[in-house]
């Protein structure tokens, strides 16, 4: 079964953690300062992005999820900038604003794609009264499906054990991006997402997958977790769940440019996917694909559902193969975002012959992507009568998917594909034979939507019915 995106509009997530503002100063450098042996950067562009728990929330909002963010800030310009940016992205902000603390701010000076220096403006929020955050968390639990605790060891999660208990008592899964070696404070969490270095600081050095799995399950047992997702850079990710076989996911990153904020993206996609109804295993696959996208970007970054869909389906020139209707709609949406022309045709294709191959090759030349809608077995029998189809639908679709001209093959159960075509609305609908455009199923809907209908000729002498008659008659 192919992996598909959930409807993130159904996801509601509470994010609690260390909120930061990431600032970037960009500019060229071409000389050394006369005052000291350091490069001089001429700042030409300034950019501000939410960081830490705020970046987690922003990632969820970018996918279309509903997110409530709770954390600590100062009463200052960075806090105002964060609130304005996040509110504009439909993040519900619930900041505990403290006058005696500065909002955590990290300033990076960038030149020629490289980070020259980072300056941190922070004092942390250690020792803050737990009564400031816990009531806000508790009040929010009835409105969300999952909870993320984003720990950067800055003080917002100083009372994390109490937070976990409140959420778990309310029946909410708790996902934690941990910090430090004290995993005891995370006892009872649903899932932790340590990177390999963080994992080894607690479990000890690992030299093989088997050793990682063994030590990971020991941690799950010791700290009463339900699962661990260990992120392993170029080696991908490993999901360990109680009572389940380990799931090793290879990295999907094509290029690693900047890992800043990648962990935020992983946990945001993971928790929002579960909130939208995905299994933990499928949510981890989506998070793995998302990580492969954001590490190719500079700085803390988000990704769209279009980018995530592209990462899942890949970009193989040979096409995407047999696909369900829901998946097809997502794939077509991606193609349209790319500006590609989508061509669609349909048929029984009971015995694929040279005429079919030539016809499909011609159809493929008319656009960038070719969809072939195939009658199901019951549909073929209703059209052709007893004894048909000769080949069951899974085999017919597999053969079609193997053709280089074909991108997607999708089944339909009705007598005609009119409903399917009216929902896909390709740029170009084609059909082979002696049809008139106005008589082709779905043609009127395609034309009404601004598309085109075209009739292509079949190669003379090629007929599925004649081939079947010849075989049954012992000829050929």
From Swiss-Prot:
The active site is at residue 264. Residues 344-476 are annotated as: Cytidylyltransferase. In the N-terminal section; belongs to the carbohydrate kinase PfkB family. In the C-terminal section; belongs to the cytidylyltransferase family. Residues 1-319 are annotated as: Ribokinase. GO terms for cellular component: cytosol. This is Bifunctional protein HldE. InterPro entries: Bifunc_HldE, Carboh/pur_kinase_PfkB_CS, Cyt_trans-like, PfkB_dom, RfaE_dom_I, RfaE_dom_II, Ribokinase-like, Rossmann-like_a/b/a_fold. Its EC number is 2.7.1.167, 2.7.7.70. GO terms for biological process: ADP-L-glycero-beta-D-manno-heptose biosynthetic process. It comes from the Bacteria. Catalyzes the ADP transfer from ATP to D-glycero-beta-D-manno-heptose 1-phosphate, yielding ADP-D-glycero-beta-D-manno-heptose. ATP binds at residues 195-198. Homodimer. GO terms for molecular function: ATP binding; heptose 7-phosphate kinase activity; heptose-1-phosphate adenylyltransferase activity; phosphotransferase activity, alcohol group as acceptor. It is an enzyme of class 2 (transferase). It holds the Pfam family PfkB. Pathway: Nucleotide-sugar biosynthesis; ADP-L-glycero-beta-D-manno-heptose biosynthesis; ADP-L-glycero-beta-D-manno-heptose from D-glycero-beta-D-manno-heptose 7-phosphate: step 1/4; Nucleotide-sugar biosynthesis; ADP-L-glycero-beta-D-manno-heptose biosynthesis; ADP-L-glycero-beta-D-manno-heptose from D-glycero-beta-D-manno-heptose 7-phosphate: step 3/4. Keywords: ATP-binding, Carbohydrate metabolism, Kinase, Multifunctional enzyme, Nucleotide-binding, Nucleotidyltransferase, Transferase. It catalyses: D-glycero-beta-D-manno-heptose 7-phosphate + ATP = D-glycero-beta-D-manno-heptose 1,7-bisphosphate + ADP + H(+); D-glycero-beta-D-manno-heptose 1-phosphate + ATP + H(+) = ADP-D-glycero-beta-D-manno-heptose + diphosphate.
């Amino acid at each position: 079964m192919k992996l598909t995106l959930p409807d993130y509009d159904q996801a509601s997530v509470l994010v609690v953690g260390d909120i930061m503002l990431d600032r970037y100063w960009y500019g060229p450098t071409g000389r050394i300062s006369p005052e000291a042996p350091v490069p001089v950067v001429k700042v030409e562009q300034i950019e501000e992005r939410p960081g830490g728990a705020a970046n987690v929330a922003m990632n969820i909002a970018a996918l279309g999820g509903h997110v409530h963010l709770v954390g600590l800030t100062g009463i200052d310009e960075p806090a105002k900038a964060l609130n304005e940016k996040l509110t504009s992205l439909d993040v519900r902000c619930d900041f505990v604003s403290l006058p005696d603390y500065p909002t955590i701010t990290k300033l990076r000076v960038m030149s020629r794609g490289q980070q020259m220096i980072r300056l941190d403006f922070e004092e942390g929020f250690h020792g803050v009264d737990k009564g400031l955050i816990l009531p806000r968390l508790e009040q929010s639990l009835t409105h969300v499906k999952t909870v993320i605790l984003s720990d950067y060891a800055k003080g917002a999660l100083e009372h994390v054990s109490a937070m976990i208990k409140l959420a778990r008592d309310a029946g909410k899964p708790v996902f934690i991006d941990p910090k430090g070696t004290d995993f005891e404070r995370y006892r009872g969490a649903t899932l932790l997402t340590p990177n390999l270095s963080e994992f080894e600081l607690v479990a000890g050095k690992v030299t093989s997958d088997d050793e990682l799995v063994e030590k990971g399950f020991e941690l799950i047992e010791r700290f009463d977790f339900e699962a661990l997702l260990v992120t392993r850079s170029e080696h991908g990710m490993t999901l360990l769940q109680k009572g389940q076989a380990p799931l090793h996911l290879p990295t999907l990153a094509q290029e690693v440019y900047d890992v800043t904020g990648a962990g935020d993206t992983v946990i945001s996609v993971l928790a929002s996917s579960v909130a939208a109804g995905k299994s933990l295993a499928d949510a981890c696959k989506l998070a793995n694909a998302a990580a492969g996208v954001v590490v190719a970007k500079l700085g803390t970054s988000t990704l769209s559902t279009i980018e995530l869909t592209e990462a899942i389906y890949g970009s193989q020139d040979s096409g995407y193969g047999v696909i369900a209707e829901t998946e097809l709609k997502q794939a077509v949406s991606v193609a349209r975002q790319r500006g590609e022309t989508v061509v669609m045709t349909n048929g029984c294709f009971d015995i694929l012959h040279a005429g079919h191959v030539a016809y499909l090759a011609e159809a493929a030349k008319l656009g960038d992507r070719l969809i072939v809608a195939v009658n199901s077995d019951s549909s073929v029998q209703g059209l052709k009568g007893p004894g048909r189809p000769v080949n069951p639908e899974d085999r017919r679709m597999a053969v079609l998917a193997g053709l280089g001209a074909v991108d997607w093959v999708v089944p339909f159960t009705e007598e005609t594909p009119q409903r399917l075509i009216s929902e896909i609305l390709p740029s170009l609908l084609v059909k082979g034979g002696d049809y008139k455009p106005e008589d082709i199923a779905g043609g009127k809907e395609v034309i009404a939507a601004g598309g085109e209908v075209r009739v292509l000729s079949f190669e003379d002498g090629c007929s599925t019915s004649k081939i079947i008659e010849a075989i049954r008659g012992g000829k050929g």
